[in-house]
């Protein structure tokens, strides 16, 4: 996606991920596999739309679908610079779950600095002088994992954490 377009991102996510689940296997015996569930509503937070528009996820996704919400809608917002990297790094989701170009993750047991996000799994990659981070939360009720955050950081904290090998073994 050379030019950023919310509708293209929505359509891509809808086609490749939304409504689907995948099984992830790890080399950690206490969590040797888990299910990741994908929902198009996750895009609202992944792309940081909650920072620049007062809409709920269902309304923002519907507005994107109808092309009433575009990047132009909030390009002048004071927090646009916070969400632009999220949109630019959207394809990292595919790198993790489809292209299998990321081979290690960090599990909750190894996350030393707990944040308010309460992430259960973190995928990351170094990109020049920054890290692209995709975090998952665990839904205790369904015992599945969901995409929760996609952002950039300059912090090198993830480099020092113990890493766990993983593999996407099947799409359900």
List where the protein language model places each region.
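An acidic, glycine-rich, mixed-charge low-complexity segment common to nucleic-acid enzymes
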Residues: 1-124
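Conserved binding-pocket/active-site segment within a compact domain
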Residues: 91-172
């Amino acid at each position: 996606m050379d030019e950023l377009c919310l509708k293209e991102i929505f359509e891509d996510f809808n086609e490749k991920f939304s409504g689907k689940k995948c099984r992830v296997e790890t080399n950690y015996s206490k969590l040797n596999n888990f299910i990741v569930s994908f929902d198009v509503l996750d895009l609202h937070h992944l792309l940081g739309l909650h920072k620049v528009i007062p809409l709920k996820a269902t309304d923002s996704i519907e507005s994107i679908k109808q092309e009433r919400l575009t990047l132009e809608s909030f390009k002048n917002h004071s927090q646009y610079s916070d969400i632009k990297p999220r949109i630019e790094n959207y394809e990292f989701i595919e790198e993790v779950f489809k292209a299998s170009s990321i081979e290690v993750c960090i599990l909750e047991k190894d996350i030393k600095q707990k944040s308010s996000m309460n992430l259960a799994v973190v995928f990351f990659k170094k990109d020049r002088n920054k890290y692209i981070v995709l975090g998952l939360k665990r839904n205790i009720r369904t015992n599945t994992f969901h995409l929760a955050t996609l952002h950039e950081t300059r912090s090198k904290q993830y480099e020092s954490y113990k890493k766990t090998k993983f593999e996407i073994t099947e799409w359900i």
